[in-house]
């Protein structure tokens, strides 16, 4: 038995024959199955997916758009989600019991989502309650596990995306005096600062030391940030910005708010994946842009806008490795197992977790 087989069950591993198929043959089979299944099959794809996968998506979008699509689609029996695990979980929780959600590769996870597990979160909430009493409301970025969404749901909180973070943080402060923001400290910090909350009124909870890190007066803390981050956006630096300013002084810099505060502050624009796409789309021909977000998306934007000069803010960036787990062979494999009635990699969230998580999701969806 190989090391991989010990880590991943053999039945969820891609069969050998898919490695030897030509791209043309795989694409032909995907088209055949899509045509055969019609509206009973729905393939949502995240913007960070590879082109070889996105070309077959029935809907492409960011986390908010895909959550809305999942919630509104009642016709498809099979939803083959081309994204990462937490997105497929969200789709399962927002669809009916008769609909089946499949993730083509179960290894497509999210390191940020894994930075906040439920045991750590329950322990943190208990300790923070000792400090602040019943003055807190939890918000979680949708880039989190179903269990964390459920935690927020049963504690009066909600989910957020990078598209609606300002709206949801503003709402949270109408409910409680303080906010606990999971699991991405950078999105939480950038959003709160953008709403006028000074940095010295923000603290960071370290789940590994069970300690609160802060510089100002503890009584004045308004935002408690979970010490988590996106492994992709963490790699954009102020030095990258300085290099662009030096070598291309007329180039606009636009970044995702999962980048650290210093990078966002030094950029010209910051916003969600959809915001970045729309901004470049509406920019005049001949304009110049350095984009600080995932590389698959940056490359796609470059291809779609040959009339504009577009580069990655960090020229040495790699695509999101876990997003890249979903590829054409895994997509075809998932579709062929459906065709045979032998579905693999079915995502099924526990009923109680779903009920509580949907509370958090609906508090978001009804406000956007």
Curated annotation (Swiss-Prot):
Binds 1 [4Fe-4S] cluster per subunit. Disulfide bonds: none annotated. [4Fe-4S] cluster binds at residues 110, 230, 320. It is found in: Cytoplasm. Its main location: cytoplasm. It comes from the Bacteria. GO terms for biological process: 'de novo' NAD biosynthetic process from L-aspartate. It catalyses: iminosuccinate + dihydroxyacetone phosphate = quinolinate + phosphate + 2 H2O + H(+). Keywords: 4Fe-4S, Cytoplasm, Iron, Iron-sulfur, Metal-binding, Pyridine nucleotide biosynthesis, Transferase. It is an enzyme of class 2 (transferase). Catalyzes the condensation of iminoaspartate with dihydroxyacetone phosphate to form quinolinate. This is Quinolinate synthase. The gene is nadA.
């Amino acid at each position: 038995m190989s090391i991989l087989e010990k880590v991943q069950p053999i039945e969820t591993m891609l069969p050998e024959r898919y490695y030897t198929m030509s791209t043309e043959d795989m694409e032909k089979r995907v088209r055949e199955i899509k045509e055969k299944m019609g509206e009973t099959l729905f393939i949502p794809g995240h913007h960070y997916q590879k082109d070889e996968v996105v070309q077959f998506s029935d809907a492409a979008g960011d986390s908010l758009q895909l959550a809305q699509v999942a919630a509104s689609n009642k016709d498809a029996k099979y939803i083959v989600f081309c994204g990462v695990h937490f997105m497929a979980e969200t789709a399962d929780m927002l669809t009916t019991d008769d609909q089946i959600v499949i993730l083509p590769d179960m290894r497509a996870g999210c390191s940020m989502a894994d930075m906040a597990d439920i045991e750590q979160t329950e322990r943190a909430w208990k300790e923070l309650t000792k400090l602040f009493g019943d003055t807190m409301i939890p918000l979680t970025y949708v880039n989190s596990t179903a269990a964390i969404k459920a935690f927020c749901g049963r504690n009066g909180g909600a989910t957020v995306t990078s598209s609606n973070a300002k709206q949801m943080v503003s709402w949270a402060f109408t409910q409680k005096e303080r906010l606990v923001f999971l699991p991405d400290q950078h999105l939480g910090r950038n959003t709160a600062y953008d709403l006028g909350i000074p940095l010295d009124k923000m603290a960071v909870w370290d789940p590994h030391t069970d300690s609160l890190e802060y510089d100002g007066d503890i009584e004045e803390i308004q935002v408690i940030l979970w010490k988590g981050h996106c492994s992709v956006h963490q790699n954009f630096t102020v030095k990258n910005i300085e290099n662009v300013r030096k070598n291309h002084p007329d180039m606009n810099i636009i970044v995702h708010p999962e980048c650290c505060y210093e990078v966002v502050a030094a950029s010209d624009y910051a916003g969600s994946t959809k915001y970045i796409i729309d901004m470049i789309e509406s920019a005049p021909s001949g304009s110049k842009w350095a984009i600080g977000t995932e590389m698959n998306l940056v490359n796609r934007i470059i291809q779609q806008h040959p009339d504009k000069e577009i580069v990655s803010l960090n020229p040495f960036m790699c695509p999101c490795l876990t997003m890249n787990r979903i590829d054409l062979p895994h997509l075809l494999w998932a579709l062929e197992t459906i065709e045979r009635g032998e579905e693999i990699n079915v995502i099924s969230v526990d009923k109680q977790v779903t009920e509580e998580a949907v509370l958090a999701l609906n508090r978001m969806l009804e406000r956007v």
